[in-house]
Amino acid sequence: MIDFKKEVIDRSFEMPIVVDFWAPWCGPCRILGPVIEQIATEQEGQWALVKLNTEEQEEISYQYGIRSIPNVKMFYRGEVIDEFTGALPRQMILEWLKKGLPKPGLIALDQLLAEHANPEATAVESLLERYPDSPEIRIVLSQLILWDQPAKVIEILEPVKMGTPYYDKASHLREIASFLCMSVDDAEIMEIQDLIKGGHLHEVLPKIITTLGKNPKVADGQLAKAAIGIFQTLGTQHELTKAYRKQLDMVLWA
């Protein structure tokens, strides 16, 4: 028997874990087993294989809804992120792994964030140099340097194109950065820019709402886009979103 929490759940925070749910009496399991074991050996270091005998660990099998075997589930950061049932041929398993495995850049980023909840921007920049194709790293780095280096944020996020999973997040960050990069001679807008750059969101959000209440299209509409971007970036559960988002919607859409 395996220690499921230790060997699967806990370890999945370090790397993806693929669990093969099988039983000795299962013919298709005997077909799948050697194939997936060989692939695990070939791809050692990218993910780890754990074999779970459903006859020995019925409670775990029930917990994960195993009704037909062989069943293969991919765990990452404690959650099932993909699965298949049946004795798939080698090529289909390889395609499943290619599609479902978290990219190396995301794994490296998750490891960094697990060690440092608030990492230095330089550490994330180093990751981006190693994994330039990782949109997740681009998003996190942009969030870290947004107030100080908005022009660089626009550059960093340029490769995140429409139709990709992180496009919406990138767009909101770009809207904020674009507003901060604007050259204006309006003292009120300049003050708002300075407050945002200083990270004084508690102070600036009421000012933004007041300014937009007078003219929703001020600063060529960029202030409104930046305000929406700030709330989207903070998330719906953030205290500032709860306090001010409805007020923003009222001045923009009333």
Where are the model-predicted features located?
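The canonical Cys-X-X-Cys-His
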Residues: C26-C29, V72
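Typically the conserved alpha-helix immediately C-terminal to a functionally engaged Cys/Sec
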Residues: P28-E44, L52
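Non-globular targeting/processing and membrane-anchoring segments
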Residues: G86, K98-A254
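A short beta-strand-turn-helix
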Residues: M1-I17
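Non-catalytic, surface beta->alpha helical segment in thiol-disulfide oxidoreductase systems
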Residues: R67-A108
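Hydrophobic beta-strand anchors of alpha/beta hydrolase catalytic cores
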Residues: V18-V19, L49, V72
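Short pre-active-site segment immediately N-terminal to redox-active cysteine/selenocysteine motifs
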Residues: M15, W22-W25, S68
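Structural microenvironment flanking redox-active thiols in thiol-disulfide oxidoreductases
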Residues: T54-I60
